[in-house]
């Protein structure tokens, strides 16, 4: 069974609108539909302590943690801010997401 359909896709640029990383922008690295979450580059950084294994020494690794999809909005480069999207159908029948304010297409 597939998860829910989310309003963001992989490689979209998004703006965090709530939480400790509010107003940060980043690229979507991974979509997790079953958790309603996404991984955003440089947002919600957590520290992971790793134990020494064999010849490797223990260390503290910083990595992105999941953020809920409701806490982000798609970033429109033409409007230069976070925007809502609308779905438009092109002449060839293909559906694309567009900015509500300016009409800029996000799906090329």
From Swiss-Prot:
Pfam families: KOW (PF00467), ribosomal_L24 (PF17136). It comes from the Bacteria. SMART domains: KOW. One of its GO terms (cellular component) is ribosome. The keyword rRNA-binding applies. Keywords: Ribonucleoprotein, Ribosomal protein, RNA-binding, rRNA-binding. InterPro entries: KOW, Rib_uL2_dom2, Ribosomal_uL24, Ribosomal_uL24_KOW, Translation_prot_SH3-like_sf. One of its GO terms (molecular function) is structural constituent of ribosome. The keyword Cell membrane does not apply. NCBIfam families: rplX_bact. One of two assembly initiator proteins, it binds directly to the 5'-end of the 23S rRNA, where it nucleates assembly of the 50S subunit. One of the proteins that surrounds the polypeptide exit tunnel on the outside of the subunit. Belongs to the universal ribosomal protein uL24 family. Part of the 50S ribosomal subunit. This is Large ribosomal subunit protein uL24. It comes from Geotalea daltonii (strain DSM 22248 / JCM 15807 / FRC-32) (Geobacter daltonii).
């Amino acid at each position: 069974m597939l998860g829910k359909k989310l309003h963001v896709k992989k490689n979209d640029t998004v703006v965090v609108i709530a939480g400790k990383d509010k107003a940060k922008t980043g690229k979507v690295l991974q979509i997790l539909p079953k958790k309603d979450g996404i991984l955003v580059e440089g947002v919600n950084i957590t520290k992971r302590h790793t134990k020494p294994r064999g010849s490797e020494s223990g260390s503290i690794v910083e990595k992105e943690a999941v953020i809920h999809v409701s806490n982000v909005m798609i970033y429109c480069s033409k409007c230069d801010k976070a925007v809502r999207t609308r779905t438009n159908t092109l002449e060839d029948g293909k559906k694309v997401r567009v900015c509500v304010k300016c009409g800029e297409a996000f799906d090329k």
